[in-house]
Swiss-Prot record:
Source species taxonomy: Bacteria, Bacillati, Bacillota, Bacilli, Bacillales
Region (Disordered), start-end ranges: 581-611
PANTHER family with a match to the protein in the record: HEAT SHOCK PROTEIN 70KDA
Protein name: Chaperone protein DnaK
Job of this protein: Acts as a chaperone.
Pfam families, sorted: HSP70
Length: 611
């Protein structure tokens, strides 16, 4: 069975891993890094992903970051006159990770387990699955990030019974999950979170502070200057990381703007204490879901055996201190917060292929599910933190006499009124026979699969007529749209590959021109002048083809020149060997003469020892 890769599709960074020899291993990208920035840039019809895209973000307005924050919404980003959905941008990142995995494994990769924040709703999960399909991946399972982290942590500790709290603060989302580990079973008891809280917000408080300080000093608002803002973002992210290791950092941005007197520079010292003051409310916002998760699990902090920190933002000292204060436990530092989620996804991939045995994962739905009933009330059918997969049915009736149809309004959330919760979808059950209100019996059934994706059925128990939908949110893509995007993604991947091959061909041609010059110079006066002239002529023809940028001509001229250069190189080696042979013969003669002159024959007699 082919390998199933594990992918942590992050807000700021992504990571891919695979099971090898019973162990999950992170797959490095072509630059040798173990994580890849979740950044996509478009430049001259070329798509760039990762570090190369992030590096040119200051000068390229067609750079997209933190697209994960828009998953499951109808947000679109316009690039060079074309609109892209968050699923399409995420698919470009996934294609890049897929290519890294294929290069590492040396075989095609078609299946993946992709992680999502535990607090992702149905629309966000569907969008993630669609992104995988567009990237050419069969998404075998969607699993929650904290659960994946627990899988990676607990793989070697299956014989220990323990309750663990996973505190996952990533680039754009925050989750906390509480799990019980026992006999290879990883059971999630509760989960809570905030999908609008992460490392980006910590960067933002530094950016806001820098903008305010610069405005106070120079009366210029840098937030209105896109290029300056991107430089501020890069500086803020670097300062945040620096302050995890030192107590003070220097932020220096020369020529950030210009005033009447000339260029203006931003120079500022930021202390860890000031950063902690600026971000105090963000740290506090992580504690409320932590308390809620403990309450839902029916546990107190003292019942916990381990607290595991996941996500790059948990390196912030104030965050570590806050969770230590809240739980009374020193956070466990034995996992890499940037990689552990991808490793856990790879473990789940191994479970699905049978490479990992004796592991059972029981996850929960993060939000309650239900329908709108009379008076705009939200009636829950499945409570949050219910173990999935699960199914639940309830019988409802009509609200008016002779009502011919019922509208089923499917919602997800915790508020008592329907209007305050997230709409997942609507559908209609029609052809209900005329009857007084309250008589028809309409059975509504909710199914949640192992990916946390919802299916809803409504059935008239009198006629057995049934209507069913898989939830499609306003951002949900139809099969036709996904197919179209898959074809576009494949075409773009082919175009990217072709562009790469073109660049490689030009590089090889340039290298050959340089090599020819060197060979011709080395052979000057050593071979027939006609042969040198032939090589020079072929080299000039190749240079002309390179300047014309005619790829077919470059290929043909390169092949022709390569053959000539090979023949000349053979002659060069033959001459070198002939010269070496002559030198050796000369040396041997000299040695023979030396022997006759200097060697003296000596007499010796055997001395026998007395016995």
């Amino acid at each position: 069975m082919s390998k199933i890769i594990g992918i942590d599709l992050g807000t700021t960074n992504s990571c891919v891993a695979v099971m090898e020899g019973g162990e999950p291993k992170v797959i490095p990208n072509p630059e040798g890094n173990r994580t890849t920035p979740s950044v996509v840039a478009f430049k001259n019809d070329e798509r760039q992903v990762g570090e190369v895209a992030k590096r040119q973000a200051i000068t390229n307005p067609n750079t997209i970051m933190s697209i994960k924050r828009h998953m499951g919404t109808d947000y679109k980003v316009e690039i060079e006159g074309k609109k892209y959905t968050p699923q399409e941008i995420s698919a470009i990142i996934l294609q890049n990770l897929k290519a890294s995995a294929e290069a590492y494994l040396g075989e095609p990769v078609t299946k993946a387990v992709i992680t999502v924040p535990a607090y992702f709703n149905d629309a966000e999960r569907q969008a993630t699955k669609d992104a995988g399909r567009i990237a050419g991946l069969e998404v075998e399972r969607i699993i929650n990030e904290p659960t994946a982290a627990a899988l990676a942590y607990g793989l070697e500790k299956q014989d220990e019974e323990q309750k663990i709290l996973v505190y996952d603060l990533g680039g754009g989302t925050f989750d906390v999950s509480i799990l019980e580990l026992a006999d290879g079973t990883f059971e999630v008891i509760s989960t809570a979170g905030d999908n609008r809280l992460g490392g980006d917000d910590f960067d933002q408080v530094i950016i806001d502070y820098l903008v305010a300080e610069f405005k106070k000093e120079n009366n210029i608002d840098l937030s209105q200057d896109k290029m300056a803002l991107q430089r501020l973002k890069d500086a803020a992210e670097k300062a945040k990381k620096d302050l995890s290791g030192v107590t003070q950092t220097q932020i220096s941005l020369p020529f950030i703007s210009a005033g009447a007197a000339g260029p203006l520079h931003l120079e500022l010292n930021l202390t860890r204490a000031k950063f902690e003051e600026l971000s105090a409310n963000l740290v506090e916002r992580t504690l409320e879901p932590t308390r809620r998760a403990l309450k839902d699990a029916g546990l107190s902090a003292s019942d916990l055996d381990k607290v595991i920190l996941v996500g790059g933002s948990t390196r912030i000292p104030a965050v570590q201190e806050a969770i230590k204060r809240e739980t009374g436990k020193e956070p466990y530092k034995g996992v890499n917060p940037d990689e552990v989620v991808a490793l856990g996804a790879a473990v789940q991939g191994g479970v699905l292929t049978g490479d990992v045995e004796g592991v059972l994962l029981l996850d929960v739905t993060p939000l309650s599910l239900g329908i709108e009933t009379m008076g705009g009330v939200f009636t829950k059918l499945i409570e949050r933190n219910t173990t999935i997969p699960t199914s639940k049915s309830q019988v409802f009736s009509t609200a008016a006499d002779n009502q011919p149809a019922v509208d089923i309004h499917v919602l997800q959330g915790e508020r008592p009124m329907a209007a305050d919760n997230k709409t997942l979808g609507r559908f209609q059950l029609t052809d209900i026979p005329p009857a007084p209100r309250g008589i028809p019996q309409i059975e509504v059934t909710f199914d949640i699969d192992a990916n946390g994706i919802v299916n809803v059925r409504a059935k008239d128990l009198g006629t057995n007529k049934e209507q069913a939908i898989t939830i499609q949110s306003s951002s949900g893509l139809s099969d036709e749209e996904v197919e179209r995007m898959v074809k576009e993604a494949e075409a773009n991947a082919d175009a990217d590959q072709k562009r790469k091959e073109e660049v490689e061909l030009r590089n090889e041609a340039d290298q050959l021109v340089f090599q020819t010059d060197k060979v011709v110079k080395d052979l000057e006066g050593k071979v027939d002048a006609a042969e040198v002239a032939k090589a020079t002529e072929a080299k000039d023809a190749l240079k002309a083809a390179i300047e014309k940028n005619d790829l077919d001509e470059i290929r043909a001229k390169k092949d022709a020149l390569q053959e000539i250069v090979q023949q000349l190189t053979v002659k060069l080696y033959e001459q070198a060997q002939a010269a070496a042979g002559a030198q050796q013969a000369e040396g041997a003669q000299g040695n023979a003469g030396a022997k006759n002159d200097n060697v003296v024959d000596a007499e010796f007699e055997e001395v026998k020892e007395d016995k």
